[in-house]
């Protein structure tokens, strides 16, 4: 039987055609793979969520000793007798080196210890605490310590914005009259930088001094009448004015026009 002889030029042509076809197929597959990978990355990026920031901390993170004390919310140096302790927040007493003449009263803290990070509100001073230390009420002690027995633990804390959704409150001290002015600020989102009063519609402002042992703002002497405008300057520099604030009704918190 005669064999069919194929010329070498045809064999070479078919071999070359096969190589070209394979290269095109491989290149197409690689391109498809990269396109798919790029699309996957875009989809993952679009589906990612960003955690909402609570705002920057208002102090550096402080390391110190955490101790326990039997807090009585309304009778500490901050005298929050008419402002209930915010739900979910522990009462914290601040060491004297961070007391700042009661400026930290009502400040919100994030406190971190062996049990995790939890929130508290400054309601008292702790003269017996070592520098940078804080006293914790029973609830926040058990949270921060991880249910340890009362004692001393290592903690880290920082002042953070409270983010209350309501305006801050002004409350007058027992004994006020048109001849004696004494105002407490409650529920501020951040510590205040200053509190001022105007008795002439804002033409001039009288600075009030915060009393370090009672958390009340008072003028240098005398009273400022029955009503006045009150200007708040927050620690951030934000300012707002509340018109015609009652200065003589005792222990009846009234809302301001805004919050820090």
What is the predicted function of each stretch?
Residues 2-107, 116-118, 123-132, 139-260:
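Mature exported/compartmentalized surface modules and terminal targeting/interaction regions
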